Structures are given as C-alpha cells and as structure tokens.
Swiss-Prot record:
InterPro entries: Ribosome_maturation_RimP, RimP_C, RimP_C_sf, RimP_N, RimP_N_sf. Its main location: cytoplasm. This is Ribosome maturation factor RimP. Required for maturation of 30S ribosomal subunits. Signal peptide: none annotated. It is found in: Cytoplasm. CDD domains: YlxS_C.
Length: 151
C-alpha cells in the first residue's frame, strides 16, 4: 500500500515540473485533526517567493480536485534551503563527501541520531562515516535526513 507521501508525490510531480521546477521532496505531518503538507521545490536558477506562490496555487488546485487528505491541512511550499532535507538515494549520492545529520527509525550503532559524512550510496544503502567508523544504513530506516551547510 502506498503511503500518503508516495501518493502525494505521484500526484504533484507533473504539475510542479510543468511550472519548470523539480519536486525535491515532500513531507506530510499529521497532528491531531490538522495536517501539514510541506512541498520542497528546486530549480537550477534558484527558487524565489514568486515561484513558491505559483507552485502553491497549482498544487492547491490539484489537491482540491483529487482530495487525498480527509482532514484539514496547511500547504507550505518552499525551497529546500541550505540545510536541505534529503529524501532519496539520488539526493544522498549528490552529496557524497558532505556532512549530514539523520534520524533513524531503528537504532544503528546504538543511536537513532547520527551526524557524519556520506561516503557512498549503493542501491538503497547509505554508507555514512561517523567518528571514523563506517556505518551501512538502509535508506528506508532514515526518518529524516538533512545536509549540514558549510559556512
């Protein structure tokens, strides 16, 4: 069975791409009777507030027609930002040798929260070097992953 995030991604990918952007990822957060649909868009030229507003209008129209969420929700559209969330193998691969922080569903090496350097991605497995130790982590065990920006 597809998760709500997967259904939303399938539903929203084409409309976002039709506007010239990439659907970087999305989050669906349910909190009681209210939910948040957070849509991240990216573009080679950068993402501006006007882009977010345009995508928000289009996505809102699609969600109104398809009606995939039965509760009240807030729609948020933004760029991934400098501490961009990472959603899939392709995105982790793009940031090899970069530092990330991840939250896991099941502990690895006794921890659910890790910070380390992405040293490889093979299939659906991430290799993360944490304090000199190489850890192999299944991508489906990652609840949340973010790039740590260098300044």
């Amino acid at each position: 069975m597809a998760t709500i995030e997967n259904r939303l991604e399938e539903m929203l990918k084409s409309p976002v791409e039709a506007l010239g952007h990439t659907l970087w990822g999305l989050e669906y957060i349910q909190a009681g009777k209210h939910s948040v649909v957070r849509v991240y868009i990216d573009n080679e030229k950068g993402v501006f507030i006007e882009d977010c507003a345009e995508v928000s209008r289009q996505v809102s129209a699609v969600l109104d027609v398809e009606d995939p969420i039965s509760t009240e929700y807030t729609l948020e559209v933004s760029s991934p930002g400098v501490d961009r969330p990472l959603f899939n193998a392709e995105q982790y691969t793009a940031y090899i040798d970069e530092t990330v922080k991840i939250q896991l569903t099941m502990p690895v090496a006794g921890s659910r929260n890790l910070k380390g350097t992405v040293t490889g991605v093979e299939g659906q497995m991430l290799t993360l070097t944490v304090d000199g130790n190489e850890l192999i982590i299944a991508l489906d065990n990652i609840r949340k992953g973010n790039l740590i920006a260098k300044f």
